[in-house]
């Protein structure tokens, strides 16, 4: 190792001296000790300076790449503490080390090539430094480009910015939002496993008021649905079923009216059936908040609300039909009374007779009109009888008592109305006293503005002074 390094040092020294232009004669002259001439470089420099200057010239000639490799070789071959070791062992060791270094270099280059191949080409750096300097927004570059090229470049820049933004968003993780360091300082909260305690109430001992309160808190819509169920069932029983019986008997002709009655009847029954199902769920303590029956109830409620407009229009006719049916039932139960007087036919009866001449007129409608006329005639007769009886009672009745008899005041003196209320009496007394006081003593008037004369004028005969006592 020592011999090899010495040989390399001698070779380098010879190369440096050859490049510096020194020969053996120059060395001999130096050895003779003759003084150098002023034009010679040795006049200002010694051998050490010449050596370093020659070495720097050689370095500049070779280039920076060779300089770095040379410096590395020099650093490696610099000997500090020499050891007496055979050159053969050193050469074997160096050869093995060189092989290992070569293998390491091959492995590192293969790993580096694989890493470079796995990198996305869009993320790699460019080959020209000019790409990362200057700008295309200047007036010089814009003047040399057409409007179409400028718009194309702007569009490409916008697309590139969007791609970068998406890539950065995909690379974000939970740690990037800065929540982890906050959680690190958070104090751990001890979790206590609490046993679930269920309080069983004896409903037999709870009052009705408390039960209603609990029911309203648990399901406030339950009471409203129960009331709605009762109302709809009553309407079905008292109104819709009798009208449908008239439709079946033929009293009400088939048409839109009968179809409307059937639709309303079926709608009410379905609505009541869904409410009953909801009540069954509540009785079995099944949670019904997410059950489909709630949605079905809302649908039926909306349809019923839409029918309310039609119900208002047809309410008078439905009431008339129901009263007509009640009158017909009563008429069947009581025998017909013979009419003693013959009266002219009414307009409705004449219209009914006229309608019988039409071939398409239904006999059920004619029967309905006749029943309605008979009922109105009976009602008119009852009103006449009641009016005659009332007139007879008024003729035989006694005279009514007078106001004086009813009040029975006797010789009570007349009193003012204001005396009945002491508060109002004293209030009125105070108001009159203030008026009298205003005439006796002048009110204090503050000088909000400069004096401009008497507002009401000055009367010489008026004296408002107070007498001394």
UniProtKB/Swiss-Prot annotation:
Biased composition, class Basic and acidic residues, residue ranges: 440-451
Residues annotated with Citrulline modification: 375
Keyword Acetylation carried by entry: yes
Tissue expression per record: Detected mainly in subsets of neuronal cells of the brain. In the 17.5 dpc embryo, mainly expressed in the olfactory bulb and cerebral cortex. Postnatally, additionally expressed in the cerebellar cortex, most strongly in the hippocampus.
UniProt modified residues of type Phosphoserine: 37, 146
Main localization category: nucleus
Pfam families: Sas10, Sas10_Utp3
Keyword entries, A-Z: Acetylation, Chromatin regulator, Citrullination, Developmental protein, Isopeptide bond, Methylation, Nucleus, Phosphoprotein, Ubl conjugation
Gene Ontology biological process terms, A to Z: brain development; chromatin organization; ribosomal small subunit biogenesis
Region (Disordered): 17-44, 62-158, 410-469
Compositional bias of kind Acidic residues: 68-107, 149-158
Signal peptide location: none
Listed Basic residues bias regions: 412-439
Disulfide bridge map: none
Post-translational modification: Citrullinated by PADI4.
Alphabetized InterPro entries for the sequence: Sas10/Utp3/C1D, Sas10_C_dom
Modified residues (N6-acetyllysine): 140
Record localization: Nucleus, Nucleolus
Record-level GO cellular component terms: nucleolus; nucleus; small-subunit processome
Description of how the protein assembles with itself and partners: Part of the small subunit (SSU) processome, composed of more than 70 proteins and the RNA chaperone small nucleolar RNA (snoRNA) U3.
Biological role: Essential for gene silencing: has a role in the structure of silenced chromatin. Plays a role in the developing brain. Part of the small subunit (SSU) processome, first precursor of the small eukaryotic ribosomal subunit. During the assembly of the SSU processome in the nucleolus, many ribosome biogenesis factors, an RNA chaperone and ribosomal proteins associate with the nascent pre-rRNA and work in concert to generate RNA folding, modifications, rearrangements and cleavage as well as targeted degradation of pre-ribosomal RNA by the RNA exosome.
The name this protein goes by in its record: Something about silencing protein 10
Gene this chain is encoded by: Utp3
């Amino acid at each position: 190792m020592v011999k090899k390094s010495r040989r390399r040092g001698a070779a380098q020294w010879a190369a440096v001296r050859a490049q510096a232009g020194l020969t053996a004669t120059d060395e001999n002259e130096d050895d003779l000790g003759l003084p150098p001439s002023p034009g010679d470089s040795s006049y200002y420099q010694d051998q050490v300076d010449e050596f370093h200057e020659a070495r720097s010239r050689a370095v500049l000639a070779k280039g920076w790449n060779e300089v770095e490799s040379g410096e590395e070789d020099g650093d490696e071959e610099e000997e500090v503490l020499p050891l007496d070791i055979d050159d053969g062992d050193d050469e074997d060791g160096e050869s093995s080390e060189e092989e290992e270094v070569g293998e390491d270099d091959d492995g590192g280059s293969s790993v580096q090539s694989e890493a470079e191949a796995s990198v996305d080409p869009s993320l790699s750096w460019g080959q020209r430094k000019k790409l990362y300097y200057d700008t295309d927004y200047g007036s010089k570059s814009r003047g040399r480009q057409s409007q179409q090229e400028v718009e194309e470049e702007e569009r490409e820049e916008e697309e590139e910015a969007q791609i970068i933004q998406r890539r950065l968003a995909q690379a974000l993780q939970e740690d990037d939002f800065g929540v982890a360091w906050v959680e690190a300082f958070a104090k751990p909260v001890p979790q206590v496993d609490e046993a679930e305690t269920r309080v069983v109430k004896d409903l037999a001992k709870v009052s009705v008021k408390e039960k209603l309160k609990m029911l309203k808190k648990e399901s406030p819509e339950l009471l409203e649905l129960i009331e709605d169920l009762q109302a709809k069932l009553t309407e079905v029983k008292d109104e819709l079923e009798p009208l449908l019986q008239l439709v079946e008997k033929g009293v009400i002709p088939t048409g839109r009216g009968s179809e409307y009655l059937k639709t309303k009847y079926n709608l009410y029954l379905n609505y009541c059936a869904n409410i009953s199902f909801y009540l069954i769920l509540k009785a079995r303590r099944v949670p019904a908040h997410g059950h489909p029956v709630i949605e079905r109830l809302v649908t039926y409620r909306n349809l019923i609300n839409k029918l309310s407009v039609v119900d208002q229009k047809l309410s008078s006719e439905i009431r008339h039909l129901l009263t007509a049916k009640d009158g017909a039932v009563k008429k069947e139960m009581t025998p017909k009374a013979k009419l003693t007087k013959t009266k002219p036919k009414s307009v409705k009866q004449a219209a009914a007779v006229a309608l019988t001449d039409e071939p398409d007129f239904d006999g059920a409608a004619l029967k309905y009109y006749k029943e309605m006329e008979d009922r109105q005639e009976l009602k008119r007769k009852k009103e006449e009888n009641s009016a005659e009886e009332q007139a007879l009672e008024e003729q035989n009745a006694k005279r009514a008592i007078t106001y004086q008899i009813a009040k029975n005041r006797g010789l009570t003196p007349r009193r003012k109305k204001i005396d009945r209320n002491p508060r109002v009496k004293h209030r009125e007394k105070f108001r009159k006293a203030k008026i009298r006081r205003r005439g006796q003593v002048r009110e204090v008037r503050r000088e909000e503005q400069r004096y401009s004369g008497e507002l009401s004028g000055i009367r010489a005969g008026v004296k408002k002074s107070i007498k001394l006592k």
